[in-house]
From Swiss-Prot:
Primary enzyme class: transferase
Domain of life: Bacteria
Span list, region Disordered: 201-225
Gene3D superfamilies membership: Vaccinia Virus protein VP39
An individual GO BP term: methylation
Protein name as annotated: Putative S-adenosyl-L-methionine-dependent methyltransferase FRAAL5401
Pfam short name (any one): LCM
InterPro entries with a match to the protein in the record: Ppm1/Ppm2/Tcmp (IPR007213), SAM-dependent_MTases_sf (IPR029063), SAM_mthyl_Trfase_ML2640-like (IPR011610)
Signal sequence extent: none
Family that this chain belongs to: Belongs to the UPF0677 family.
Species name: Frankia alni (strain DSM 45986 / CECT 9034 / ACN14a)
UniProt key word S-adenosyl-L-methionine: yes
């Protein structure tokens, strides 16, 4: 598949960045079969099947074992990541927040699987082909949202605030935002713009959850690219070519946590390494992807000035 990033590129769930959303759903499907204590996503496997990539379907449904393709660490990280964001949303909405925004929602099914409080509105933003596919597929499965689900079919590089408002979003009300697994697929300046816009659209007492990846030390990114290329080679041997190293943006960028803190967000966080330990999962070993130092951060906006 063609996957090199360029300005204005688009995708579906079988190509480019969209394929990474499908691969993440594969990991959630495998994790759900292995350990419903941390994650229970009954829609992951059916959504992957509907995308139509045979290898990913067989992995998601258990017809092919993950050994050698989906490493155990990816499955374990899928478990703790899902749990972190699930708990974030439920805690936020149980405080009275009734607006939820999921940026780059991909195959996320939280609008269908979480026990949202009555009156919660969940806004999902993603490329038009992605949100149309998920809406159509889940409707065909007979799935019913557990919240008032609204979609904004828009590229996050375009005027997504206008699309969000058109769907009914009210920036005067507190909101719970997530940018899950998104920021590494944005250029550094686009990441800043996204976080600035989230802040501008956030009333006091809004909440946010995302990831903070430390800036690389010399040699870190070369090792990361080599590791991603090794992973892609394993997939190519099975006639699936995600070309993962070419989908991300590299180089230094503003780290998420201090950037948001400077804009009035009070944040806490926990590293992937500590989350794995907290849930009794095996530690990371050869961490060429630098996952262990990624911190999942969440917090509240209490200030109205930058």
């Amino acid at each position: 598949m063609t996957s090199t990033r360029h300005d204005g590129d688009t995708w579906d769930l079988a190509s480019s960045v969209g394929a990474t959303a499908t691969m993440a759903a594969v990991a959630r499907a495998i994790a759900t079969r292995a350990d419903r204590r941390l994650i229970d996503d009954p829609f992951a496997a059916p959504l992957v099947r509907a995308v139509g990539i045979d290898l990913l379907t067989r992995l998601a449904t258990g017809d092919v074992p993950p050994d050698g393709l989906v490493e155990q660490v990816a499955i374990d990280v899928a478990k703790v990541r899902a749990r972190f964001y699930d708990e974030f949303f439920l805690e936020a909405t149980n405080t009275g927040i009734t607006q939820v925004v999921i940026l780059a929602s991909g195959l996320d099914s939280r609008a269908y699987r979480l026990p949202w409080p009555i009156g919660t509105v969940v806004y999902e933003l993603d490329q038009p082909r992605v949100v149309e596919f998920k809406t159509r597929t889940l409707a065909a499965l007979g799935a019913v949202p557990t919240a008032d689900r609204r979609v904004a079919a828009v590229d996050l590089r375009d005027d997504w605030p206008a699309a969000l408002r058109a769907a009914g979003f009210d920036p005067a009300r507190p909101t719970a935002w997530s940018a899950e697994g998104l920021l590494g697929y944005l250029p550094p300046e686009a990441q800043d713009r996204l976080l600035d816009t989230v802040t501008e659209l956030s009333a006091p007492e809004s909440r946010v959850a995302t990831e903070n990846r430390p800036n690389p030390k010399p040699g870190d990114e070369d090792r990361t690219k080599e590791a991603l290329n090794r992973i892609s080679e394993r997939w190519r041997a099975h006639s699936f070519d995600p070309d993962m190293a070419r989908l991300r943006y590299y180089g230094e960028r503003n780290e998420t946590a201090p950037y948001l803190a400077d804009r009035g967000w009070a944040l806490t966080g926990i590293s992937v390494r500590d989350l794995l330990a907290a849930h009794g999962l095996p530690p990371l070993r050869d961490d060429d992807l630098r996952m262990g130092d990624v911190r999942y951060v969440s917090g509240v906006r209490n200030k109205t000035t930058k």
